[in-house]
Swiss-Prot record:
Protein name: Alanine--tRNA ligase
Native source species: Rhodopseudomonas palustris (strain BisB5)
GO biological process: alanyl-tRNA aminoacylation; negative regulation of DNA-templated transcription
Record note on domains: Consists of three domains; the N-terminal catalytic domain, the editing domain and the C-terminal C-Ala domain. The editing domain removes incorrectly charged amino acids, while the C-Ala domain, along with tRNA(Ala), serves as a bridge to cooperatively bring together the editing and aminoacylation centers thus stimulating deacylation of misacylated tRNAs.
PANTHER family (alphabetical): ALANINE--TRNA LIGASE, CYTOPLASMIC, ALANYL-TRNA SYNTHETASE
Amino acid sequence: MSGVNEIRSAFLNYFAKNGHDIVPSSPLVPRNDPTLMFTNAGMVQFKNVFTGLEKRPYHRATTSQKCVRAGGKHNDLDNVGYTARHHTFFEMLGNFSFGDYFKDRAIELAWNLITKEYGLPKDRLLVTVYSEDDEAFGLWKKIAGLPESKIIRIPTSDNFWQMGDTGPCGPCSEIFFDHGDHIFGGPPGSLEEDGDRFIEIWNLVFMQFEQVAPGNRTPLPKPSIDTGMGLERIAAVLQGKHDNYEIDLFQALIRAIAELTGADPQGEQKGSLRVIADHLRAASFLIADGVLPSNEGRGYVLRRIMRRAMRHGQLLGAREPLMWRLVWALVREMGQAYPELVRAEAMIEETLRLEETRFRKTLERGLTILDEKSGSLKKGDMFDGDTAFTLYDTYGFPLDLTQDALRNRGISVDIASFTDAMDRQRAKARASWAGSGEAATETVWFGLRDKLGATEFLGYDTETAEGVVTALVKDGKEVEALKAGDAGAIVLNQTPFYAESGGQVGDTGVLTGEGVRFRVTDTLKKAGDLFVHFGTVEEGTVKPEAALALEVDHSRRSSIRANHSATHLLHEALRQVLGDHIAQKGSMVAPDRLRFDFVHQKPITQDELRRVEDIANDIVLENDEVTTRLMAVDDAREAGARALFGEKYGDEVRVVSMGKASREHGSNAFGWSVELCGGTHVRRTGDIGLISVTGESAVASGVRRIEALTGRHARQSANAAMATAKAAAAELRTTLDDMPARIASLMDERKKLERELSDARKKLAMGGSGAAGAADGGADVRDVGGVKLLARAVEGIEIKDLKSLVDQGKKQLGSGVIALVAKSEDGKGSIVVGVTPDLVARFSAVDLVRKASEVLGGKGGGGKPDMAQAGGPDGSKAQAALDAIAAAIGG
């Protein structure tokens, strides 16, 4: 049982034998929990079970949970690579009891696992208990036979767990392993407890109280158990290692990195190897769970992780993208336990490759900006920390690289102000993740769900029905009546109204009864499967137990059905045209339009869009029957039905199929497009009428979006487009067929005129004959200390044209310096300085342009010794800037 995979399996199988359901790891992006950026503990997916808001079909569970700690208060990112046990990604083994067994059984199960199944020597184990938890103290003594000296009472909050200011809470008991007296450190609670000798391997939380208010706790009627054991830590113990990075899983990854880079796993670059191994795991699992690199939220944290790893790849000498070439090694080690890693392997590789390619461009851009911002600084000066943070936060330019680049010039970074800026950013990020405060209002829905049960949905077969009012809600509270003019919500025993889910908007319509009319403006799901009808009472008073006639807006529902079925066809068509890596990231199905978001790393060409549209419309024209069937979820997936990753499905699922399975790109025997879907659909594909793709765009890095119309909306859009095209053709005095050629001709003519205008501006700026005339003994050429200087302020010239004029001037001067300053419409000044080859040993264009930039109010400048550019906010001082250059040459 020495390998990580064997240790994980042994844990799960042990608890399964002891009556626990093995529950798969939840995604790293928490479902329905806006308070967390990432899943960071095993209990996260059971949070609502512990609080009583959710019920599961089991009372005991065991998991191996994927966790990430790289944001918010749980942030291990900066420590990774420098300690033996910090990770951004880790696995947490756990067992849970929801009102079933409690302390005695939890302690017995834990002790038997580590001493009998895992075989740890009892004399190297000790435990802690909360100082007031006499019960746990006695149970450890009785069950484990531990002497009192090895049952340590801890009076601090380290051994008392709370979910928040209110909610379930209780004492903890931690199990520690003694690595031996050859390692510094004392037992928990001692002065030397921060040493590495005694390492916590398992934490048992005994949830036995309800925190009603600060200082006010009441006993829970059904105490529960939540435990967590870091897989990497227990693996290190079982493999006789004191360092998590020396376990078999990490060593396999480190060997793969070393083979690609030539680095010595035990040499000076050991830290970089560890960073890459850890960050490879975090980045790969986050991408597999649907997170993609971006500049905000979860995507921003992922980007930080990836770029930190890529920077360490550079330190190892990697000159080409490295991380994507390591994914295979991770899949080999962890793919069996986490099949989502196997499914997403190609996407992970492509995302890492593209991000590292972009990062190299970021490095180049960052160095240029750094040069400009630090140009006026001298040896011994300090670089502004706010600017360093802007480079880091806005441009992705790492602080350590900023420090390295400035160190050669004897310039340090103001770390204090950088840290202040970082703290401000973190505070802002924490505030954005502080949650929406909806938990209290959601309680009413969970309470109604417990009391009333699930709503029976009739809408697959009908748009009209009769129902009985079972509850009324107004302003987040259950009420006994809704009167005319009241805005509120109605819960019914059954309904044909579809509740918003899976990207499909909720139905609208009317509920009518004797003297009563309620206009439904939206239908939403609450507490899982409680259908709630939101709207306004137009007539009468609605009361519980009233019988109502329920009528969905037929025209709106028909349009929604067409758009939802069209998303399925477009999804499959995209896979056929672009490849099987296409995976849905989201959708919006409304009555008047649809959009579909999917994983793809580059823009879709117009030809590809046309092919996608044509393929989807071919299925529409075939007018095939759309079939639905109920299947066991495992059978449906095995049959090839596509599912939205991370979506929660029940044991039985609805499978929607359309198109002939015999088509070239058929999904399986059920049809051409086969997906798990709970939405409403057309009866035949011909009911869609027409699919018109209206746009394609980027949503985030690696995520594209297509938008489309169907049916009459598509027809109206096509008619409007045709009318616009005809009007444009008339203006151009040509036909529709000849219009593209006519436009191309006009564009060529425009480019020609723009070139002529640019040439004219250059000549005018240089006195009517261009740089040559001005340079050839013109009034603007003067002798400064034996050096010819052509210096002139010009109007209306862009920076790229300034460079061109300076190049011409250098050629005409033969030997000398040319400086041109242009004032823009907004009053800013731009300056370009050129030095002929024979003078670059005496004068650097970079030094000269920086002198001028200071006069214009700018800082720094950049370029090469023979050509440099800069700018400043005050273009009115153009002549003074040129005089500063002359003074520098003459000095």
